[in-house]
Amino acid sequence: MTEDWLTLREKLAAAFTRFLETCEQLDPRLHEQETVDGQWSLRDIVAHFTVWDHEATERFWRFLAGPTEDITYNNDEFNARAVAARQHLSYNQAIKELNSAHKGLEEASAAVQPEDLAADGRFVEWLGALSDHYEEHTAQLKRVISQQHF
């Protein structure tokens, strides 16, 4: 199980890196304009990842502290609050905040031991979902990049 956890952590790290690399390829004029499905700017996408990484970090520390109840999230409301709360940030500030939140998630996931994984399957569930989420938005951004005209 430990090997699978390490693989999952590596998968998330790779997905996070690909996301940031893809962000760098986007025309800077689009950082704060609506770009993805006409809904969110790149800054907004970054902001929502910041909050999900922070939430995962908090959940991991709670899981490690002992039994906790499941929480059901309304993803649309959660995302809307995350984006609204960060409208005052520039794109560069949002990236800095994401890097900080992701570092916290890396630290929390590194603290998870084999016995923790055996006791609570939510660690794997969260990390897998985050990896997939980064990949999903990376693919969206790559479509935007392919449509850019320089």
Describe the predicted segments one by one.
Residues 21, 35, 84:
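Short, flexible active-site loop motifs that bind/organize anionic cofactors or intermediates
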Residues 9, 20, 43-46, 61, ...:
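Non-transmembrane alpha-helical segments in soluble domains
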Residues 14-17, 21-24, 54-55, 78, ...:
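Generic structural signal for well-ordered, non-membrane alpha-helices
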Residues 1-29, 51-62, 132:
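Alpha-helical bundle segments that constitute or directly flank the non-heme di-iron/ferroxidase center
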Residues 5-12, 16, 91-98, 123, ...:
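Hydrophobic packing residues in well-ordered alpha-helices of helical domains and bundles
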Residues 32-77, 114-150:
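Short, contiguous alpha-helical
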Residues 1-7, 55-100, 104, 145-150:
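Short, helix-capping/interhelical loops that line the mouth of catalytic, cofactor-
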